């Protein structure tokens, strides 16, 4: 199963309501076969701009990151679930940055002088 990261912005709510929303979201992930690794609270802060979601205007929101493994088929249904949840302002699922393929730098590859001089410019006769 690939590793994903869920970035959530929740409505500004009291602590019990926020906990209930997070619990509901995590349970929805696990119902779809996900294995949750970590939940990180990034705090409540002002949104960068006013966001309309579910017929409401939001100026503040709680930011959360959820790190999880899930089957690829579960991601699409989870995005749909998040879009219907009235307490979620924004939800975005991306592949975890640490699992993306990284290529090692091969260093500087020397180019032969003749190829460098004659490959791009042909001399006039």
From Swiss-Prot:
A Pfam family it matches: Ribosomal_S6
Organism listed in the record: Homo sapiens (Human)
Gene3D superfamilies xrefs: 3.30.70.60
GO MF, one annotated term: structural constituent of ribosome
Gene Ontology CC: mitochondrial inner membrane; mitochondrial small ribosomal subunit; mitochondrion; small ribosomal subunit
Alphabetized UniProt keyword annotations: Mitochondrion, Ribonucleoprotein, Ribosomal protein
Listed GO biological process terms: mitochondrial translation; translation
Protein name as annotated: Small ribosomal subunit protein bS6m
Self-association and partners: Component of the mitochondrial small ribosomal subunit (mt-SSU). Mature mammalian 55S mitochondrial ribosomes consist of a small (28S) and a large (39S) subunit. The 28S small subunit contains a 12S ribosomal RNA (12S mt-rRNA) and 30 different proteins. The 39S large subunit contains a 16S rRNA (16S mt-rRNA), a copy of mitochondrial valine transfer RNA (mt-tRNA(Val)), which plays an integral structural role, and 52 different proteins.
Cellular localisation: Mitochondrion
Entry's family note: Belongs to the bacterial ribosomal protein bS6 family.
Coiled coil: none
């Amino acid at each position: 199963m690939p590793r994903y990261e869920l970035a959530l912005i929740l409505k500004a709510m009291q602590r019990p309501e926020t906990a209930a929303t997070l619990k509901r979201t995590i349970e929805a992930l696990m119902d779809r076969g996900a294995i949750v690794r970590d939940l990180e609270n990034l705090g409540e802060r002002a949104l960068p701009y006013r966001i309309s979601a579910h017929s409401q205007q939001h100026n503040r929101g709680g930011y959360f990151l959820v790190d999880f493994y899930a089957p690829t088929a579960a991601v699409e249904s989870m995005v749909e679930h998040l879009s219907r949840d009235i307490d979620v302002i924004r939800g975005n699922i991306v592949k975890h940055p640490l699992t993306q393929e990284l290529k090692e730098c091969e260093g500087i590859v020397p180019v032969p002088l003749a190829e460098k001089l004659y490959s791009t410019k042909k001399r006039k006769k």
